[in-house]
């Protein structure tokens, strides 16, 4: 595995593989790798000649009161895990490498960001698409891999790829979970022992809401109540419970089509997000 920190090194390696017409799978991350990231890397390994992973904690996607400085980092461990997952090139730039000067041009996302996490984190997705635009130009991937735990991010990136005619395929991978259902996340390390025991309630609550809809419940207020019940028994504070069309992230006139139930819950030092995405048959549509 090649570990590179400078853009010129990365571009030279990518050029060598492009000349051989190799397919390139790209897994962008902020590091502190867990099984979710490694699943993305393994998918990329199975589907491409070359696998590139980036580790970059992007300051543009953190708000003024968020955890940029304290975001967990362990580069030595990350390098070992990336190598074991079959990564060929690990790109680990610092902030000065990616933003040599204060950016004179950044991206602005106009749709799909005024709900869910974007509602409480203004500018977050602008930072995400700005850094991804840079990374996509540098890596020139055939396929780029993202986890559906961050479903809003996947929806925004999907729109960005289409709007800017990036010649790449977005591969969205189902959320990787612990045995008790908790979505794997770098921020899970912030949970106390008690909070860690409570946290699986998020997924149980989401599945309860999904089950109710699949069994015919169409009263949205009742679905919210069902999802809320399990969370209220924890020490977490509900940030949001929302139901939208997916990937458009628009309010539903009726519960039909591709639907997302998404949730965010704040514990003492961790804000956890999770979701379920599923198809709801329209009236008269046959179940498959």
Swiss-Prot record:
Active site (record annotation):
37
Task: Provide a GO CC annotation, any one.
Answer: cytosol
Provide this UniProt record's keywords sorted from A to Z.
ATP-binding, Cytoplasm, Ligase, Nucleotide-binding, Pantothenate biosynthesis
Which residues are recorded as binding ATP?
30-37, 147-150, 176, 184-187
**Predominant location:** cytoplasm
Enumerate the subcellular locations listed in this protein's record, separating them with semicolons: Cytoplasm
> At the top level of its lineage, which domain of life is listed?
Bacteria
Q: What does this protein do?
A: Catalyzes the condensation of pantoate with beta-alanine in an ATP-dependent reaction via a pantoyl-adenylate intermediate.
- Give the HAMAP family listed for this entry: PanC
Q: Which NCBIfam families match?
A: cyt_tran_rel (TIGR00125), panC (TIGR00018)
Subunit structure, interactors included: Homodimer.
Report the sequence similarity comment from the record. Belongs to the pantothenate synthetase family.
Protein name (Swiss-Prot/TrEMBL) = Pantothenate synthetase
Instruction: Report the gene name.
Output: panC
């Amino acid at each position: 595995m090649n570990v590179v920190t400078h853009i010129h090194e990365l571009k030279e390696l990518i050029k060598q593989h492009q000349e051989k017409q190799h397919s390139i799978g790209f897994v962008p991350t902020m590091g502190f790798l867990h099984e979710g990231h490694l699943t993305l890397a393994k998918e990329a390994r199975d589907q491409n000649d070359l696998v590139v992973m980036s580790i970059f904690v992007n300051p543009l996607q953190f708000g003024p009161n968020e955890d940029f400085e304290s975001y967990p980092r362990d580069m030595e461990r990350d390098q070992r895990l990336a190598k074991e997952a079959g990564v060929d090139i690990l790109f680990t730039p610092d902030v000065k490498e990616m933003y040599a000067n204060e950016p004179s041009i950044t991206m602005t996302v106009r749709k799909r960001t005024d709900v869910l996490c974007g509602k409480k984190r203004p500018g977050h997705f602008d930072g995400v698409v700005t850094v991804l635009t840079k990374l996509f130009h540098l890596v020139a991937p055939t396929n780029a891999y993202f986890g559906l735990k961050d479903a809003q991010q996947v929806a925004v990136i999907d729109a960005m790829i289409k709007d800017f005619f990036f010649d790449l395929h977005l591969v969205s991978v189902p959320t990787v979970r612990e045995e008790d259902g908790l979505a794997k996340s770098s921020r899970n390390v912030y949970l106390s022992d008690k909070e860690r025991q409570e946290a699986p309630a998020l997924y149980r609550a989401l599945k309860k809401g999904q089950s109710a809809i699949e069994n015919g419940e169409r009263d949205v207020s009742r679905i919210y109540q069902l999802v809320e019940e399990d969370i209220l028994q924890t020490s977490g504070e509900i940030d949001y419970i929302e139901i939208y069309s997916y990937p458009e992230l628009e309010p539903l006139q009726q519960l039909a089509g591709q639907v997302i139930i998404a949730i965010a819950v704040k514990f003492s030092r961790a804000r956890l997000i999770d979701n379920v995405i599923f198809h709801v048959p329209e009236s008269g549509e046959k179940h498959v």
